[in-house]
Structures are given as C-alpha cells and as structure tokens.
Regions:
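Short alpha-helical "recognition helix" segments of helix-turn-helix
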Residues: 40-45
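Short, Lys/Arg-enriched anionic-surface-contact patches
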Residues: 3-23
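C-terminal flanking helix
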Residues: 60-71
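Short amphipathic alpha helix immediately N-terminal
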Residues: 19-34
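Short acidic DE-rich linear segments
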Residues: 70-78
Length: 78
C-alpha cells in the first residue's frame, strides 16, 4: 500500500470539515501535522495507544477521500 501524500493545509481543512469531536480533532491534528507517534499521543490525551490507533483508522479513509475530492475540484474553481 502506498503512503498517501498531503500538505499540512490539506490535512487541516479535511480534519475541520470531517471530524466533529474536539478530542478526536486534536489527536488527528497532532498525528497528521506533527507526525506524533501513538504512545506519546496516548499519554498526552490520557487514553490507550490502541484507542488512538482506532481513532486514526476511523477517519483515515474519509480524510484521504476529502483531500482527493478537494484536489480534483480545486481546478474547476480557478
């Protein structure tokens, strides 16, 4: 599986548009912006690393899908 490439701005916009839970939003921002690892994130937010992994997995496809959609439709706006 290839790693999906995105900019920090793309990740920020996708997170803001898709994720409504503030705690999940904060975790995803730290993960996608700072490339934070699971254990430090779990410690920072007082949850288990498995829970952090589940949160990331829950939103990954939606975030990547939003970024791809945005890229495809950005051209039509200009």
């Amino acid at each position: 599986m290839r790693h999906f490439k995105y900019t920090k701005d793309e990740a920020e916009e996708a997170i803001d548009q898709i994720v409504h839970d503030e705690k999940h939003r904060a975790i995803l921002r730290r993960r996608y912006h700072d490339k934070a690892l699971l254990e430090p994130l779990a410690e920072e937010f007082g949850i288990e690393p498995r829970t952090v992994s589940d949160i990331i997995a829950k939103y990954r496809a939606d975030l990547e899908g939003f970024i791809k959609w945005r890229r495809n439709h950005q051209e039509s706006f200009y």
